[in-house]
Amino acid sequence: MLKLKIAVLFTVTCLFSSWAWAHTAGPSPEALWKEVQILQKTHAIMPGSTPFQLGSRTVDPYTVDLANTLAISTIKKAGGILKVTRYSNGSLVVKENYNAHKQLVGVTAMLKAAKYDPSDRNWIMAAYDPTGKVLAYGKVGSCIACHVLVRHQDLVFAPPPTQLLPITTWKAFFSKQEMNPAYVTQIQKHPEAVVQ
Protein backbone atom coordinates (compact mmCIF):
# COMPACT_ATOMS: atom_id res chain seq x y z
CA MET A 1 0.00 0.00 0.00
CA LEU A 2 2.89 2.36 0.80
CA LYS A 3 4.39 1.77 -2.67
CA LEU A 4 1.04 2.62 -4.27
CA LYS A 5 0.77 5.87 -2.28
CA ILE A 6 4.31 6.85 -3.27
CA ALA A 7 3.60 6.08 -6.94
CA VAL A 8 0.41 8.16 -6.85
CA LEU A 9 2.20 11.04 -5.11
CA PHE A 10 5.01 10.94 -7.70
CA THR A 11 2.55 10.93 -10.61
CA VAL A 12 0.46 13.76 -9.16
CA THR A 13 3.56 15.83 -8.38
CA CYS A 14 4.97 15.39 -11.88
CA LEU A 15 1.66 15.99 -13.60
CA PHE A 16 0.69 18.99 -11.49
CA SER A 17 4.02 20.74 -11.75
CA SER A 18 4.32 20.07 -15.49
CA TRP A 19 0.73 20.98 -16.15
CA ALA A 20 1.27 24.31 -14.38
CA TRP A 21 3.55 25.40 -17.24
CA ALA A 22 1.66 23.71 -20.07
CA HIS A 23 -0.42 26.72 -21.08
CA THR A 24 1.84 29.62 -20.10
CA ALA A 25 4.86 31.36 -21.52
CA GLY A 26 6.97 29.29 -19.13
CA PRO A 27 8.55 29.36 -15.68
CA SER A 28 11.56 31.26 -14.42
CA PRO A 29 14.93 29.49 -14.76
CA GLU A 30 14.85 28.79 -11.02
CA ALA A 31 11.35 27.27 -11.16
CA LEU A 32 12.42 25.06 -14.07
CA TRP A 33 15.45 23.92 -12.05
CA LYS A 34 13.07 22.77 -9.31
CA GLU A 35 11.21 20.68 -11.92
CA VAL A 36 14.53 19.19 -13.04
CA GLN A 37 15.35 18.28 -9.44
CA ILE A 38 12.06 16.37 -9.12
CA LEU A 39 13.06 14.21 -12.10
CA GLN A 40 16.55 13.71 -10.67
CA LYS A 41 15.26 12.67 -7.25
CA THR A 42 12.76 10.21 -8.72
CA HIS A 43 15.16 8.83 -11.36
CA ALA A 44 12.56 9.44 -14.08
CA ILE A 45 14.60 7.89 -16.89
CA MET A 46 13.35 8.58 -20.41
CA PRO A 47 12.22 5.55 -22.41
CA GLY A 48 15.17 4.37 -24.50
CA SER A 49 17.75 5.87 -22.14
CA THR A 50 19.96 4.00 -19.70
CA PRO A 51 22.01 5.21 -16.74
CA PHE A 52 25.46 6.37 -17.83
CA GLN A 53 24.97 5.83 -21.55
CA LEU A 54 27.62 7.15 -23.92
CA GLY A 55 27.96 10.89 -24.27
CA SER A 56 29.57 12.48 -27.30
CA ARG A 57 32.23 14.60 -25.56
CA THR A 58 35.32 13.61 -23.58
CA VAL A 59 34.52 16.23 -20.92
CA ASP A 60 31.26 14.42 -20.17
CA PRO A 61 31.48 10.94 -21.67
CA TYR A 62 28.38 9.69 -19.86
CA THR A 63 24.81 10.94 -19.94
CA VAL A 64 21.41 10.08 -18.52
CA ASP A 65 18.18 11.27 -20.14
CA LEU A 66 15.21 12.02 -17.90
CA ALA A 67 11.62 12.91 -18.76
CA ASN A 68 8.49 13.91 -16.90
CA THR A 69 5.19 12.03 -17.02
CA LEU A 70 3.83 14.07 -19.94
CA ALA A 71 6.91 13.45 -22.10
CA ILE A 72 7.01 9.75 -21.20
CA SER A 73 3.31 9.41 -22.05
CA THR A 74 3.87 11.08 -25.43
CA ILE A 75 6.82 8.78 -26.20
CA LYS A 76 4.88 5.65 -25.23
CA LYS A 77 1.76 6.66 -27.20
CA ALA A 78 3.87 7.28 -30.31
CA GLY A 79 5.69 3.96 -29.98
CA GLY A 80 9.11 5.47 -29.25
CA ILE A 81 11.05 8.73 -29.47
CA LEU A 82 11.73 8.34 -33.18
CA LYS A 83 7.97 8.30 -33.84
CA VAL A 84 7.01 11.37 -31.79
CA THR A 85 5.95 14.28 -34.00
CA ARG A 86 4.71 16.63 -31.28
CA TYR A 87 5.23 16.58 -27.51
CA SER A 88 2.45 17.70 -25.17
CA ASN A 89 2.68 21.15 -23.65
CA GLY A 90 4.30 20.76 -20.24
CA SER A 91 6.66 18.01 -21.45
CA LEU A 92 10.09 18.24 -19.86
CA VAL A 93 13.16 16.36 -21.09
CA VAL A 94 16.51 16.57 -19.32
CA LYS A 95 20.05 15.43 -20.09
CA GLU A 96 22.45 14.94 -17.21
CA ASN A 97 26.11 15.05 -18.25
CA TYR A 98 28.72 13.14 -16.23
CA ASN A 99 32.52 13.16 -16.31
CA ALA A 100 34.73 10.06 -16.57
CA HIS A 101 34.33 9.51 -12.79
CA LYS A 102 30.53 9.56 -13.20
CA GLN A 103 30.20 12.84 -11.34
CA LEU A 104 27.50 15.24 -12.54
CA VAL A 105 29.07 18.16 -14.43
CA GLY A 106 26.10 19.75 -16.19
CA VAL A 107 22.40 19.56 -16.89
CA THR A 108 20.42 20.66 -19.94
CA ALA A 109 16.66 20.80 -20.15
CA MET A 110 13.89 21.40 -22.66
CA LEU A 111 10.41 22.40 -21.50
CA LYS A 112 7.47 22.63 -23.90
CA ALA A 113 5.44 25.75 -23.00
CA ALA A 114 2.53 26.88 -25.19
CA LYS A 115 2.94 30.37 -26.66
CA TYR A 116 6.62 30.54 -25.69
CA ASP A 117 8.33 30.44 -29.09
CA PRO A 118 6.10 29.05 -31.86
CA SER A 119 8.89 29.35 -34.47
CA ASP A 120 10.90 26.79 -32.46
CA ARG A 121 7.99 24.58 -31.44
CA ASN A 122 7.56 26.32 -28.05
CA TRP A 123 10.60 24.74 -26.40
CA ILE A 124 12.38 26.58 -23.60
CA MET A 125 16.04 25.53 -23.64
CA ALA A 126 18.11 25.67 -20.46
CA ALA A 127 21.58 24.75 -19.23
CA TYR A 128 22.64 24.55 -15.59
CA ASP A 129 25.72 23.64 -13.64
CA PRO A 130 25.30 20.77 -11.12
CA THR A 131 24.20 23.20 -8.38
CA GLY A 132 21.44 24.76 -10.47
CA LYS A 133 23.32 27.90 -11.50
CA VAL A 134 21.78 29.08 -14.77
CA LEU A 135 24.25 28.97 -17.68
CA ALA A 136 21.72 29.55 -20.48
CA TYR A 137 17.95 29.92 -20.60
CA GLY A 138 15.24 30.68 -23.11
CA LYS A 139 15.66 30.79 -26.87
CA VAL A 140 19.23 29.45 -26.88
CA GLY A 141 20.36 29.69 -30.49
CA SER A 142 23.13 27.09 -30.29
CA CYS A 143 20.75 24.53 -28.76
CA ILE A 144 18.02 25.20 -31.30
CA ALA A 145 20.47 25.10 -34.24
CA CYS A 146 21.49 21.56 -33.32
CA HIS A 147 18.08 20.25 -32.28
CA VAL A 148 16.51 21.43 -35.54
CA LEU A 149 18.26 18.41 -37.09
CA VAL A 150 15.45 16.34 -35.57
CA ARG A 151 12.59 18.76 -36.27
CA HIS A 152 10.44 15.81 -37.41
CA GLN A 153 10.76 14.47 -33.81
CA ASP A 154 9.77 17.83 -32.31
CA LEU A 155 13.44 18.70 -31.68
CA VAL A 156 14.12 15.82 -29.25
CA PHE A 157 17.01 13.46 -29.98
CA ALA A 158 16.73 9.79 -29.12
CA PRO A 159 19.46 8.52 -26.75
CA PRO A 160 22.52 6.88 -28.30
CA PRO A 161 22.99 4.57 -30.03
CA THR A 162 19.44 5.00 -31.41
CA GLN A 163 20.44 8.39 -32.84
CA LEU A 164 23.92 9.80 -33.30
CA LEU A 165 25.24 13.11 -34.61
CA PRO A 166 27.42 13.05 -37.73
CA ILE A 167 31.05 13.83 -36.90
CA THR A 168 31.10 16.94 -39.12
CA THR A 169 27.98 18.35 -37.47
CA TRP A 170 29.32 17.52 -34.02
CA LYS A 171 32.60 19.34 -34.76
CA ALA A 172 30.69 22.40 -35.99
CA PHE A 173 28.84 22.69 -32.66
CA PHE A 174 31.65 21.64 -30.32
CA SER A 175 34.71 22.91 -32.20
CA LYS A 176 36.78 23.52 -29.06
CA GLN A 177 36.06 20.15 -27.48
CA GLU A 178 37.24 16.61 -28.03
CA MET A 179 34.88 13.92 -29.25
CA ASN A 180 34.49 10.82 -27.09
CA PRO A 181 36.30 7.96 -28.94
CA ALA A 182 33.62 5.51 -27.76
CA TYR A 183 30.97 7.73 -29.42
CA VAL A 184 32.97 7.67 -32.68
CA THR A 185 33.01 3.87 -32.42
CA GLN A 186 29.22 3.91 -32.08
CA ILE A 187 28.95 6.03 -35.24
CA GLN A 188 31.09 3.49 -37.11
CA LYS A 189 29.15 0.56 -35.66
CA HIS A 190 25.68 2.08 -36.28
CA PRO A 191 25.86 4.22 -39.45
CA GLU A 192 22.08 3.86 -39.85
CA ALA A 193 21.61 5.79 -36.58
CA VAL A 194 23.48 8.88 -37.78
CA VAL A 195 21.09 11.83 -38.20
CA GLN A 196 20.83 12.96 -41.81
List the model feature ranges, each with a label.
Residues 1-8:
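Bacterial N-terminal signal peptides that target proteins for export
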Residues 23-86:
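N-terminal secretory signal peptides
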Residues 9-10, 20:
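Cleavable N-terminal signal peptides
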